[in-house]
C-alpha cells in the first residue's frame, strides 16, 4: 500500500517531531536559531540564573540589527537603552560561545538577510528567531517562524520547541507577472485577499508559475510577509534556484555533505494529491502595482485607484476601523493614490533590502533627482549587500540622485533606532508593516515595492511605475 500523500509542511514537521502528547502538543527539534539584541537579553539571563549552557552553540547565530544606527558607527549610540542591548548581545555571545556579527563586521545585517546569505538557512530545516519575520527563510523550503523571549530561552537550553501543528493552506499564483509588478505586489495582493487574519492557524505554501518565476530575493519577500496575512509561516518548495543561491555559501554544506543534502532537498515538495485545508488561487496577469492606504497591510489598492470610502462598508466594526485608519493617515475618500504626496522614503528592511531590490531602485533613480520636499534613505540589508551594491556602482547612482546611502540595519522599518518619522510625516516604505506608530509616533506609512518607492521619492508623490520609463 502506497504512503498517504503529504504536504511539504507535513514532511518537514514529521522529520523534526520528537514527541506528541495526547492533546496534540508536540516537541519539535530545532535545527537553526537566529538571535538579535532585542528579544534575547532576558533569555540569556534566564540561562545564567538556572546555571544552564546553550545546548548547541554551533546551531545558533547572533547578529545586531534592530537598534544599530545606520549613520556613522564610530560615534556612540545616541540611545542608552539600545547601546545596552547591543553590549549585552556581545557579552552573551562571548560567554555562551555563539558566533556573533557585531556592527563593525561586514557580515552584519538584518537577521533575515544574513541567514540565507551565510548559508545558515537550508532547505528542510526548522528555523526560529525571536522575530516575527522569521518566515522569510521559508523561501528556501525551511519551516521558519518567530518565537517569544521565553521560547528563545527554551531553544537555547534544549534545541527544541513546544508547538501545536498548524493547518495547511496553499496559495497558487499562476500566469506571468506584468512589467512593473513585483514580489512585493504579489504578497500585498494575497494579504488584501485573505486579510490579516486569513492565515491564522495555517502554514502557507506558495505555488504556481508566478512564484516559481521569482528570484530567491523575490521569494524571500513573499515568505517574509506571511505573518502579515496571519500565518504561522510561509513555504516555497526548494528548486534549482534555491540550490544555486546556497552553493558555496560560508555555512552551507561542502563536498559529499552537499551532495547528500541535495538528495534530501529534492524530496521536499508536496506530493500530488496531498490534502490542503484551504486553497487560494490568484491570476498573476491581473495584478497591478500596489500601495497600502491605511494602517493595516490588508488595506491595499492599485496605484491607479482612489482612497476608498468607509461609508461603503456595511459591517459597522470594520467601517469604524477604516474611518479611524483614514483619520490617522490624513486621507480623504476619493483621493487618487497618485495625488498623495510623500515626505519621506525608505528602501530597506528584511522585506526589500537585498541586492535585487537595490538594483530595481537604482534603475528608477538613474539620471533623476529626489524631489526637494522628500528625504529619502536607502539602507542595505547587510554589509555584504552594501559591498556588492557599491561594487556595481549603485551607491553612486543613489547619491548623485539625492538619496542617502546608509549602513545596514533594520532602520526605519520600526521606531527602535534613530531612523524615525516625525508626527504626520508620510513615508513610501518597502518594509512590511504600516501600523500606527510603526515608523515613529503618528508617522504615516504606505507599503510599496522598491521601484515604486524610488519613483515616489523622485516625483514627490506616488506614480504608476508602469508609466515611469
From Swiss-Prot:
Keywords: 4Fe-4S, Amino-acid biosynthesis, Branched-chain amino acid biosynthesis, Iron, Iron-sulfur, Leucine biosynthesis, Lyase, Metal-binding. It catalyses: (2R,3S)-3-isopropylmalate = (2S)-2-isopropylmalate. GO terms for molecular function: 3-isopropylmalate dehydratase activity; 4 iron, 4 sulfur cluster binding; metal ion binding. [4Fe-4S] cluster binds at residues 350, 410, 413. One of its GO terms (biological process) is L-leucine biosynthetic process. Its EC number is 4.2.1.33. It holds the Pfam family Aconitase. Its cofactor is [4Fe-4S] cluster. InterPro entries: 3-IsopropMal_deHydase_lsu, Acnase/IPM_dHydase_lsu_aba_1/3, Acoase/IPM_deHydtase_lsu_aba, Aconitase_4Fe-4S_BS, Aconitase_4Fe-4S_dom, IPM_dehydratase_rel_enz, IPMI_cat. Belongs to the aconitase/IPM isomerase family. LeuC type 1 subfamily. Heterodimer of LeuC and LeuD. This is 3-isopropylmalate dehydratase large subunit. It comes from Rhodopseudomonas palustris (strain TIE-1). The lineage of its organism: Bacteria, Pseudomonadati, Pseudomonadota, Alphaproteobacteria, Hyphomicrobiales.
